[in-house]
Each structure stands twice: as structure tokens, then as C-alpha cells.
Amino acid sequence: MEKVLNKNEDIRLMKGNEALAEAAIRAGIHAYFGYPITPQSEVLEYFTLEMPKRKGIVVQAESEVASINMIYGAAGAGARVMTSSSSPGISLMQEGISYIASAQLPCLIVNVNRGGPGLGTIQPSQGDYWQSVKGGGHGDYHLIVLAPASVQEMADFVFDAFRLAEKYRNPAMILADGALGQMMEKVALPSEGSLPYSESSWATTGKTKDRERNIITSLFIEPEKMEQINIQLQEKYKKIQDEVRYEEIQTSDAEILLVAYGLSSRICQKAVDQAREKGLRVGLLRPITLYPFPKKIISELALKVEFMLTIEMNAGQMVEDVALAANGRCPVHFKGRMGGMIPSPEEVVEEIEILLEKHLSEV
């Protein structure tokens, strides 16, 4: 989980939001369109200060609805573009995100998740898992979703997200949370211009003598055509399954498996250490891609462990995908905090002990 820093790299102490924005500039984005909302406003602020120095475009739109439609237009013109928001702002973008997915345009959307539902709180949460991983907007579509667990990954995953978005012509999302956005850590920044950009063959360029004009649309009146587009999308999503990423921590001898992503996985890593000090053989599986989801490794580990416990900062969302992947091979339990509350390692260890005692009494 922790990156070894090279003394020759550009190493800085930065907030997660700032590291993400700086990485995006170094990834060569042409434009950023956004609207301020806590706890991700520093992303827009950083772009406003730095993008003009590097000949990029930054626009504070009048709303999140406007932001995502600016992304739609700029992506359709072949630009490398990004927006960011937090939970209720992402909800306002959902119609536009669905259009972008249907039109098969690459872009990066960042959700610095905060507590809800409703306007909620500005504290960190993982309550947007379903919204992010299951599509969120209308129709059968998926985003590629990456879940960072450190400020370093807030920067690194920008490059990964753009690579995947452009490889598959699909919107990608970095699903972070308010704590990761606000915390400060050392980060090794990538070199500027290290993510190559090439002219997009599918982009609209107006009239041209060199090729047929492209039409970017998500409107298909004939049901046969709409079904064919859906079939193409589903075939693409099958290919995206090859991009699954995860991290295993002390799973080789584990009898109890924690499953957690993002900030919760950092808490669980400490809980694993504390549990092992008590003689409990606990391991951790950390999904890095939430879509595609690491179903295969969960299915394999389910045959080796007594039970699984998912730790989330919500009422229980990823646990459903874990249970589906385990497919009855072992019990799957859930422990969560809601509304912006963060579970502690001690709470996790206590829950492990309670479940272990219950499990042993049933054997």
C-alpha cells in the first residue's frame, strides 16, 4: 500500500485534493470543468491557480449539471478532460454521465465522497458505492471505478484512470472520500507529459477531407439500433473485466478475511496487525478497482477462510458484491459506520472477536 519514494523524484507534502489536481495537470489534461463543494473544493482552487500557468483551460461552471455537459462537449471534441465533485454534486451529474457513457467518450470524474443521504455532512463516507459502481444514472452502463487509499494513490490513479478511459472509450471515476481529500501526506509526483496523448480518431472535427465526419450522440430512436449499442457496451464491459486490481495483505494463512476499500482498508490494515498480536489469523483483501470488481479472488479465498467481514463507511453496500462473489462458500458479515463516522481498528478487532465466538459456538 505504501510507495517507496525515490530521492530523485518530485516529492511534496500535499493534500489529497491538491495531489490529484497536480497529477491531472501533469497527465496533460486540456481542460477542467467543475463547481465548488466541500470536501473537494481544493481541486477547483488548485486548477484555478495552476492551469493558466500551463496553458490549460479551467472553468468554474454555474452548476454541476453544466460542468458535466461541458465535459461531454469537450470529450466529444477529443480533449483530455476532467471534472470533480462530492456526493450530491455527483447526483446532479448523473444524466450527463449516462450520455457520456452511451456516446462512448473518455473522461475522468472524481467523487470525493461525503456523508448522506440528502445534503448530509461534509465528513468522509463511502455511501456512494452503489451509485458509482452500479452506474448511478439511467440505462445499462458502467464506469471504470478506482478507489485510492492514500494521497499517493490520489495522484497515481489519475494516470491509471485516463489510460483506462482512453483505452476503452469509457468514463472513469476515482472514488475517494473527504478524509483522503483533506489529509496531507508525502507524494511522489509523476513527471509532466509522461502520459502520451494522440489525436482521437473518433472525435468531432467539423468538415474534413481526410475522413468521414464523426457524429457523437447518445440518441438512438430505433429500438433495434439502441439494442445494438447496448450489446456493444456489454461486450466492452466484458473486456474491462481484465483490468481488475486488488491488494492482498497477510491472506496466505488467514482464517478470517477482512474486505475493505479506500480509507476503510487503511483502518483494516491496522486491525489486522492488532488481531494477529492476539493470535488471530486475520488477513485483508483490498479491492482497488471497484468496477471491475475482484470476484475471482474473493471466490478463491472464500474456500480457505472461516468467514469474511466487510468494513465500510456506509450501511452495507460492497458487502452485497462480496457475498455474491463468495457464493455461499463461507459466511459474509458486515460492520459499518454511517453519516460521516469512521470505524476504528479497535472496533474492527472487537467485531472479529464477537463473530469468531459466535462462529465457534455454532460449530
Specify the residue positions occupied by each region the protein language model found.
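Glycine-rich beta-alpha junction loops
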Residues: 114-116, 176-183, 262-264, 315, ...
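Thiamine diphosphate
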Residues: 1-135, 142, 150, 334, ...
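Peripheral docking tails and interdomain loops at the edges
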Residues: 312-363
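Glycine-/acidic-rich phosphate or pyrophosphate-binding loops and their flanking alpha/beta elements
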Residues: 15-18, 234-256, 269
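Conformationally flexible catalytic loops at phosphate/diphosphate-handling active centers
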Residues: 40, 169-248
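Conserved thiamine diphosphate
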Residues: 124-177
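Generic long, charged, amphipathic alpha-helical segments
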Residues: 268-301
